[in-house]
């Protein structure tokens, strides 16, 4: 069994932005998805992309899978990725997060120990779509999916969790850009400003 894998969630319905967020072009000229792959491929031997639009992603050099349990949002995607993964520990990220920091990902991996979940927490809020999940999560997630309890925060509350606080995060990502996601056209404009400030 490989030590770690990555899972990209690309199953959102894009209700607030009129295009597939994974293929939005960044100021660098790359799409969000290509930027994400460039980061993850340097760290993980296996990358799984979970989507409900499989045909759009077959050209990429990743394992593309569809939700095992349909219509369950991010929880269904994480569950599916864990089921397909060959690794005990798996880094999960959404496809609309354009600034993921490889050093921060490595910090989560370093802290994995025997925990079910290693997750950043800033101002009392956790980041479930930039976190590390163990295959040990599968039974709890399945139970929650069966009961239609789909809130990631509630699922995480049932598991053994290591939280990474702002002080540790700030060493690698002081602006917390890793957690910035694109939901609207305004977010794209805001991203350019944030990237300029980070230079």
Predicted regions mapped to residue ranges:
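Nucleotide and nucleotide-moiety/phosphate-recognizing core
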Residues: 2-136, 142-149, 157-176, 192-198
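An accessory alpha-helical subdomain
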Residues: 151-152, 180
């Amino acid at each position: 069994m490989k030590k770690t894998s990555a899972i990209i969630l690309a199953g959102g319905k894009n209700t607030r932005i009129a295009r597939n967020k994974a293929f939005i072009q960044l100021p660098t000229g790359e799409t969000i998805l290509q930027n994400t792959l460039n980061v993850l491929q340097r760290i993980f031997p296996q990358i799984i992309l979970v989507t409900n639009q499989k045909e759009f992603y077959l050209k990429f050099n990743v394992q593309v899978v569809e939700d095992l349990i349909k219509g369950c949002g991010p929880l269904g995607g994480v569950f599916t990725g864990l089921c397909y993964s060959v690794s005990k520990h798996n880094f999960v990220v959404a496809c609309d997060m354009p600034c993921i920091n490889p050093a921060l990902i490595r910090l989560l991996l370093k802290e994995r120990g025997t925990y079910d979940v290693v997750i950043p927490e800033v101002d009392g809020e956790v980041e479930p779509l930039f976190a590390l999940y163990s295959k040990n999560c599968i039974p709890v997630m399945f139970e929650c999916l069966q009961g239609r309890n789909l809130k990631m925060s509630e699922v995480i509350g049932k598991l053994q969790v290591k939280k990474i606080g702002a002080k540790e995060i700030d060493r690698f990502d002081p602006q917390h850009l890793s957690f910035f996601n694109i939901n609207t056209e305004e977010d794209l404009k805001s991203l350019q400003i944030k990237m300029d400030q980070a230079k």
